[in-house]
Amino acid sequence: MTKKADPYGFAKDFLAGGISAAVSKTAVAPIERVKLLLQVQAASKQIAVDKQYKGIVDCFVRIPKEQGIGAFWRGNLANVIRYFPTQALNFAFKDVYKQVFLGGVDKNTQFWRYFLGNLGSGGAAGATSLCFVYPLDFARTRLGADVGRGAGEREFNGLLDCLKKTVKSDGIIGLYRGFNVSVQGIIIYRAAYFGCFDTAKGMLPDPKNTSIFVSWAIAQVVTTASGIISYPFDTVRRRMMMQSGRAKSEVMYKNTLDCWVKIGKQEGSGAFFKGAFSNVLRGTGGALVLVFYDEVKALLG
């Protein structure tokens, strides 16, 4: 029998997910920023073609030289602020949607319904959360892509400045640039992220007493696979985010479809996966989120 939702349980999920997300995101912030720069540099007004980063190592070497060591954490505060409600809402809604998708389903006799139910609950949770926090995700991307060294060279002076300038130049819609492809990508990512993880754990002899190392190993595989599958969607959405604040003559992509086509034609299919290896490394943080979530939830009783 599926338990009924209760306010305390929802709040506990929210808190456990948020705490684990904030800790893991701060730990992998340098990798996150390198990945972001490799993804969007071709669409950046600040990075000339001959100054583009050649790869992950080049990016790691040049960032502290050109922007200072603290630049590795540029946009991290915005990322934590964004990630806390995003991840917390994902986990909290995941359990709510589970009741809708998995009510009365026996995992032992109805495996495929159980698997598809987990996919559905994970995807729905991610899409729902995205509606609430997308402007923060947009701001985090633009702050992370800002390569100016001092205040005078920076495009934005912080989270609020980024939001204000974007709304002033593009209106509220400017904060939701790339939203459609983001929803597509988040559903694919979250479906794999939650669906496969919960299904794999559910198939273990004693899921509630699973070793933390086994949980981490399962989570590592899940986050890596789901991250690679959804990576092209992430690249396109971030490229679209880079269009806000530009004059019409400077806009590179007319819409999402145009972005897909131009990246493929002008840069090749490999461009959709720029920074993907750093995303695999970053996936360690995602795996830690899943494991920490279970541990924190257990501590909260």
Swiss-Prot record:
A motif (Nucleotide carrier signature motif) lies at residues 237-242. GO terms for biological process: mitochondrial ADP transmembrane transport; mitochondrial ATP transmembrane transport; negative regulation of mitochondrial outer membrane permeabilization involved in apoptotic signaling pathway. Solcar repeats lie at residues 8-100, 113-203, 210-299. It comes from the Eukaryota. Its main location: mitochondrion. Residues 237-242 are annotated as: Important for transport activity. The matrix-open state (m-state) is inhibited by the membrane-permeable bongkrekic acid (BKA). The cytoplasmic-open state (c-state) is inhibited by the membrane-impermeable toxic inhibitor carboxyatractyloside (CATR). ADP binds at residues 82, 94, 237. This is ADP,ATP carrier protein 1. It comes from Anopheles gambiae (African malaria mosquito).
